[in-house]
Amino acid sequence: MLTEGQAKKEVSSLYFGGGTPALAIDRLGEVIELLTSHFEITQGIGIELHPSNVTEKLLQKLSDIGVTKISIGIQSFQDKFLGILGRKENRFETMFDALQKVSFETVAMDFIFALPNQTFQDLQKDIEVAFSNGANHIAIYPFIDFGFLESGIQEFQKKEKRALLKQITDYCEERGYTRDSIWTFSKDGRASYSSMTRDNFL
């Protein structure tokens, strides 16, 4: 508890990541209330979401408890690549509809590139579906095969990953998207989502 006259400590951001923290939405509100009573959060509150959990009801609850940024782990909008990653086929219509009804400062969507038989055209399609359906920020990370997991997925060579990343970068910049980091692009130059900062963050 803050004592009388004691100022709140200023931090840049508060992020809830890993897994599916939104499944504990009621407790999440309690945690945010407690933390904001001790800290002055200057650049917003973010949370990671699984696409199958994104509904209008959930987004409204997140907005009501003070969340300003969401990051949705899409990986791909295409079933053939979701299957490679061990994900079930996703029906994204509910998510798209919810994003049209509840607004956030940042709506980020995460993707994986350099999957078997994945082409630049596949990634181009994912990028445009994202930006056309509520996202104003995307992150595109290379697939990394951690040997101990025995995924059986044939990984791209480094030079192939670099070439694909260059195509992605050129495509995004040609369309006026702002490159925020090696893996991330924003639609309007202002949206951002990064759980790692150089400033104080929680």
Model-found features: residue ranges?
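A C-terminal junction/extension of Radical SAM enzymes
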Residues: F156-L202
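Conserved non-cysteine loop/helix-boundary elements of the Radical SAM core domain that shape
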Residues: M1-L2, E10-D170
